[in-house]
């Protein structure tokens, strides 16, 4: 990612120049080229001969990762459900989110915890825990507000910070979200995934759970931009929540009937035999509404096309080649 690294140096350098600030000959903007999801490692010798400047960068960033204390972490980390950042160091940090109240989540597919934005939240939390004080402010995917897979993450954040503000900007076209008044709800970015602003504050390391606040913003993109330009913590109508076991939700939810719901039979107690069924990984390619649709693919062997109960009351055709699905 050399291009954004160079552009960041250029823009910050120009902005500082506009203010009258001048760098000394041995000074630089403290922007570093590194993967924050990896620990400090000594690659300087690898680059010293071929790319001396990069070797110096490695030495500088290793010093930052090892010695520096951070009290403010801000950003818009990437959202990548199929994360390629699977190093041992970050995986060990994320493992804390796989437990709630000392017990494993027990989720069949907790893959959402491997999303890159979750890892960046975990890193920020780790940095501020080391500092003992600080502020975290990210704009990220908003899925962790109520999804059961993230309940360990929500509880863990509540244990680290004194205040947690969750500002849901919605705009999730995957869920076909609409505004409360029925009008169209738009994303502030050109993406399908809904987003939210997370703001947390930490004044000391404490054993008490944090106060959690929630606010929401619906409407068109222009309306959201207009509101965000003038909004502050005190003007955004945050509601104080009381997240409780077992889900620790970051949304305002009516829990009047929860105890009755929790005491009812679970679905796996009613239906004792179950399975995930067929998972193709690419239904658009391997599942069709009829045999003819799949037979049009010249790469498919017609003898492997089968009828399938795709969904309840939804019978379709599937190319059932075990080597591919």
Where are the language model's segments positioned?
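SAM-dependent methyltransferase catalytic region
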Residues: 1-167, 171, 175-176
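Sequence-level detector for compositionally biased, low-complexity segments
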Residues: 84-89, 107, 126-325
